[in-house]
Amino acid sequence: MSVYSLPPAPPSDEHQLFQRAQALSGFTLGELATRAQWVIPADLKRVKGWVGMLLEFYLGASAGSKPEQDFADIGIELKTIPISAQGKPLETTFVCVAPLTGNSGVTWENSHVRHKLARVLWVPVEGERHIPLAERRVGAPLLWSPNVEEEELLRRDWEELMDLIVLGKVESITARHGQVLQLRPKAANSRALTEAIGEFGQPIMTLPRGFYLKKTLTAPMLARHFLL
C-alpha cells in the first residue's frame, strides 16, 4: 500500500467499497495512519471518532457527520466496531442523533434510524484496552442489512422510545429501555443542551440524545459472520 495524501474517489458501487474494505483487513491502525500521514492519538478519549474517520479516508466516504449515509450515492453506512479477541463487540454502536422535537408524522419507515441501518458496512477493529491504539488491527469487513427479525426488533424499540419522547418523558428514558436499540445522552459536555418536550407539553432544555445499537443485536450478527 503506497502513501496516501488524498483520499480515493468515492466508490462507484457496493462491490468496489467492499473490495477496498477487504484490502485494509490485517493492517494496524498505526500502519494506516502513517501511510495517510495522519497523527496517531495516544488514545481515543478526546477523539472518539478517529478510527472511523481514518477508515472513511481510505474508503472514500463523502458524508462526514451529515445525517445522510457515509456512502450516500450507493446507500451504505460505515460502522467501525471494536471487538474482543473472541470477536465480541466491546461497546454499543452510535446510529444517529435522536430528534427530540418536531416529530409529528415521523414513522419507522421514514426515520433516520431505519435509513442509516438499511445497508451497513461493518468493519471490526481490535478494541481491547491493553493493545496500544497504533497496534490494533483491522478485521474482515461485513456487509449487512437487518433481516426480518432484526428489523422488527428495531422498529418496536424505536416506536417505544419515540412514543416516550413525544409524550414528554425523555428524561425518564434509561439505557435499559429497548431490546436492541437504546437512547442515551450524547454530548461532549453537560452544558450542551437542546430543546425537548416536557411532561406537560412545555419546552424544556435537556442533553442531546443519540440512538445506539445494543450488543444484543451486534454480538449475534458478528457471531454469524465469524462463525463463532
Swiss-Prot record:
Belongs to the MutH family. The keyword Cytoplasm applies. It comes from Yersinia pseudotuberculosis serotype IB (strain PB1/+). SUPFAM superfamilies: Restriction endonuclease-like. Its main location: cytoplasm. It comes from the Bacteria. It is found in: Cytoplasm. HAMAP family: MutH (MF_00759). Sequence-specific endonuclease that cleaves unmethylated GATC sequences. It is involved in DNA mismatch repair. GO terms for cellular component: cytoplasm. Pfam families: MutH. Gene3D superfamilies: DNA mismatch repair MutH/Restriction endonuclease, type II. This is DNA mismatch repair protein MutH. InterPro entries: DNA_mismatch_repair_MutH, DNA_rep_MutH/RE_typeII_Sau3AI, DNA_rep_MutH/T2_RE_sf, Restrct_endonuc-II-like. One of its GO terms (biological process) is mismatch repair. Keywords: Cytoplasm, DNA damage, DNA repair, Endonuclease, Hydrolase, Nuclease. GO terms for molecular function: DNA binding; endonuclease activity.
